[in-house]
UniProtKB/Swiss-Prot annotation:
Organism: Rhodococcus rhodochrous
Pfam families: CN_hydrolase
GO terms for MF: aliphatic nitrilase activity
Similarity section: Belongs to the carbon-nitrogen hydrolase superfamily. Nitrilase family.
Keywords: Hydrolase
Entry protein name: Aliphatic nitrilase
Superkingdom of source: Bacteria
């Protein structure tokens, strides 16, 4: 990907990242809690706020600690009911809060599309507009019993004015090719959305806070980007819901396990961590000039690359389960983003416009129903 000539590496921005337990399996109550964090961050001068992986309506810890029959019968219907559709009435509450508080945010949520779900991050700007939406490319291990996969359109960044922001979920930070793709997009601020980590360790050290904090910090060093790690906390409500009186399950979901962090482009810690069982926000002021200093020595997708020897290929088209072949032989396969389709559907709900770029529904208007043909689109990468 070529660099953006308008991309600036000057200026400072105050940011915040969340460490907190959602109101598990209750989207409306979790959004209430999110709005509280949005208002708090804005009041303290932050221009950007990062939320954890599928914070709405919560991370499905049940998939790791019990059998499939128990998980499906006890949790899946309610989880689906409390998942969000892109731009629905519940998401519009977040949009309105962003606009009223003049703050941009990335929210991790369970996105439902028909009867399927996806591990998604929605990007909402200071005006309350949805500017991007991405899905986790490959859900991890038992997550694949709950969520579908993303595709090549899900590698993206968005310039919010104060900096170019991208994001990945959880163990996407273990994927070298995915990380390299993000580095190539000249990401300046990276949202690393995580759940709380849980006690399958020491048998599985990869799931420990230590291991996952290590790859998060490494992302900052490798990509020379600021990283905001946002994480859940396992509270008593989560533990009681998923473990009940089962001592073995409770041992797998110990209280706490929060580990929000903010790192500089050289890997330096920029904020004092909260206690693992505490809820709250971490703050830092980011100086974008520090990226230039870090990249002077190593820019893996720039001067420190060898594309004549090693290169990455990515297909950014939407590969949908059904493709319609027209009379002239063309198919419906394209790179149209899900956000673009959402805006087009907004227009159809207002009136007929030929220019689809200018119009949006007022945030206090009811959200339009999702268009049936929007089955698998995602926001495409900005070069």
């Amino acid at each position: 990907m070529s660099s953006n000539p308008e991309l600036k590496y000057t200026g400072k921005v105050k940011v915040a990242t969340v460490q907190a337990e959602p109101v598990i399996l209750d989207a409306d109550a979790t959004i209430d809690k999110a709005i509280g964090f949005i208002e708090e961050a804005a009041k303290n001068g932050a221009e950007f706020l990062a939320f954890p992986e599928v914070w709405i309506p919560g991370y499905p810890y049940w998939a790791w600690i019990g059998d499939v029959k128990w998980a499906v019968s006890d949790f899946i219907p309610k989880y689906h009911e409390n998942s969000l559709t892109l731009g629905d009435d519940r998401m519009r509450r977040l949009q309105l809060a962003a606009r009223q508080n003049n703050i941009a945010l990335v929210m991790g949520y369970s996105e439902k599309d028909g009867a399927s779900r996806y591990l998604s991050q929605v990007f909402i700007d200071q005006n309350g507009d949805i500017v991007a939406n991405r899905r986790k490319l490959k859900p991890t291990h038992v997550e694949r019993t709950i969520y579908g996969e993303g595709n090549g359109t899900d590698f993206l960044t968005h310039d919010f004015g104060f900096g170019r922001v991208g994001g990945l979920n959880c163990w996407e930070h273990f994927q070298p090719l995915s990380k390299y793709m993000m580095y190539s997009l000249n990401e300046q601020i990276h949202v690393a959305s995580w759940p709380a980590m849980f006690a399958l360790t020491p048998d599985v050290h990869q799931l420990s806070v230590e291991a996952n904090d290590t790859v998060t910090r490494s992302y900052a060093i490798e990509g020379q980007t600021f990283v905001l790690a946002s994480t859940h906390v396992i509270g008593k409500a989560t533990q009681d819901l998923f473990a009940g009186d089962d001592d073995a399950k409770r041992a797998l979901l110990p209280l706490g396990q929060g580990w929000a962090r903010i790192y500089g482009p050289d890997g330096k810690s920029l904020a004092e961590p909260l206690p693992e069982d505490a809820e709250g926000l971490l703050y830092a002021e980011l100086d974008l000039e520090q990226i230039i200093l870090a990249k002077a020595a190593a820019d893996p997708a720039g001067h420190y690359s060898r594309p004549d020897v090693l290169s990455l290929k990515i297909d950014t088209r939407n590969h949908t389960p059904v493709q319609y072949i027209t009379a002239d032989g063309r198919t419906s396969l394209n790179s149209n983003s899900r956000v673009e389709n959402y805006r087009l559907h907004q227009l159809a709900d207002i009136e007929k416009y030929e220019n689809a770029e200018a119009a949006t529904l007022p945030l206090d208007a009811p959200a339009p129903a999702p268009a049936p043909e929007q089955k698998s689109g995602r926001a495409k990468a900005e070069a």
